[in-house]
Amino acid sequence: MRSTKAIVAGSVFIFVVLFLLGLIYMFIAVGYNTLASDFSFLKEITGLFRYLVGIPVFMVTMFAGGYITASIANMQTYLKVWFHCLTVGLVTIGGMMYSALEYSSLTLTGIVVIILALSASSAGGFYWLRGNKINQ
C-alpha cells in the first residue's frame, strides 16, 4: 500500500507543479511576445528560450518527484527505489505525452526529454536513498 501511495504522491506532485509552471510560462510567453513585437532580434531566440528554461525546470521537478516517491516508499535497495521512481516517471510522461501526441509523432527532442525525465526521477530517488543510508 505504501508503494502505491508513493507512486501516486510523486505523480500528483509532478503533475501539479508542472501545471502551475506551465501557467506561469504562458504568462511570461505572452509578455515576451509583446516585447518581441517591438524588438525583432527577440523573435529569433524564442524557441531557444523555451528549451533553456523549460527543460532544466522540468528536470528539477522530475528530480523532486522522484525524491518524494522514494521518501514515501521508504525502500532500502537501489532496485526497489529505481522501480518506484521509474514508474512515477513513466506515469507522468505518459500522461503528458498522451495529450501532446494525439495527432503528431514523437520527435528526437521528445525522446531526449523522455530519457532526461526518467533519469531525473531516478536520480531523485537515488539521492534520497544515499542520504537515508548515510543517516542510518
Feature locations, PLM:
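Juxtamembrane/disordered regions of integral membrane proteins
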Residues: 1-136
